[in-house]
Amino acid sequence: MSLFSNHTLFIIIITVVVSLLAWQSPQLMQRLIFYPPAVQRGQVDRFVTYGFIHADGMHLFFNMFTLYSFGQAVQGLFMSKLGSLGFVLFYLAALVVAIMPTYLKQKNNPRYSSLGASGAVSAVIFSYILMNPWSTLLLFVIPVPAIVFAVAYVAYSVWADGQGRGSINHSAHLVGGIFGMLATIAIEPGIVAH
C-alpha cells in the first residue's frame, strides 16, 4: 500500500508537518486555529484547519497514535463504500461536525479558540467500536471490551463537558464519536445487527 493509498498515514503525516510548522510560526498557528470571530468574518476553512494543529507534542502524539491504531480498519470500510477518498471525506466531515456545537456556543466569544484532531479521532474510534464492539481495547494497560470503553468514554465526556472547566473540548469528543457511529451506520446499515 503506497503512502497515497494509505489515507490514515497520509493524514497523520500532513498533521505532523502542519503542527510542526505552526509551532515555529505563531502567525500560522493563529491563522489555522478555530477562532469563532474569524469564522464569522468568512474564514470558514477554520472548521477544518484547526484539526491539523496541536497544542504540543503530547497532544499530537496521542491523537496521531490513536488515529493510526484505529484508522486502518475504518479506512477500509469507508473506502469500500464511498470510493478511494471515502475515509478522507469521513475524517474531514468529522472535523466540521465535531466543532459545530462549540461554534454555536462560542460564536460571540472573542476569547475562545480550539485546536486538535480529537473530535475526528473520536469519530474514527467510535466507527471502529461499532464495527468491532467486542474487541479488546487497552485502557491504561487494562483490557476492556470496546463497548464498555464506549459507554465509559461517553459518560466521562458528558460529565467533563458539564463541568465546563479546563482546556479540553469534551463536546467535540462526544459529537465526533456520535458522528462516527452515525456515519458508519449510514454507509453500512447492517452493522447495527451485530
Regions found by a protein language model. Give the residues of each.
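A detector for small-residue-rich transmembrane helices and their helix-helix packing motifs
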Residues: 1-194
